[in-house]
Amino acid sequence: ATVLGLDSQADAREIRRRVDYLPGDIALYDQMTGRELLKFLANLRGGVDWNYVEQLAERFQSDLNRRIRKLSRGNKQKIGLIQAFMKRPELIIMDEPTAGLDPLMQQEFYALVGEVKAEGRTIFISSHIVPEVEHICDRVGIIREGELATVEDVHVLKDRALHQLEFRFAQSVPPEVFANLPGVRDVVVEGTTLNCTVVGSPDAMVKAAANYEVVGLSSREASLEDVFLAFYDGDSPNAA
């Protein structure tokens, strides 16, 4: 395996120099203050720009003078975020990075991620909060039953995977004509309007609709959560 083009075993020391990590279940030295802990970690990593550490603490509204054992879950998470960002590593690996953060601090985290991306650095995030992933990530991997089901740019996966379609016909149509088409699901007919979800290409659905008088057609962009659920429902949204 390689990380940043380096062999994960032969180049382990160099990888550690260029990578930082935030675990999902963060464990800190409770007897230390936030400042003491960050200085300790900074020394282990060969020193950091302490002015940048102070800027991060200000952004996350983190009191570095309090003992860690007295901090709430969210405030401990802030310390974890600061230690992950403070070295300005090329790659940051994070597991559930916004756990325990209030909405304002989540937005601050998203802004910081945007700045890191703009600098050409990489953040690898594991998260169950699908809207968060959609908001901040360029590429996404979906794991299903312990295996990597797909890796795609977010916009490509959304465009290719799911289509939310609404057809308006001149008269009511039989839903069973459409419900059995490949990739078509959740067919609902109300009056002369038909709504459905299409996994993969909508070609079969469009051709079937052409057998009736269509007076209107609209589509809604699928969310990443829609795509995620499609994988776990057993569909195969990778079909082009």
Regions found by a protein language model. Name each.
Residues 11, 153, 204:
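Short acidic active-site motifs
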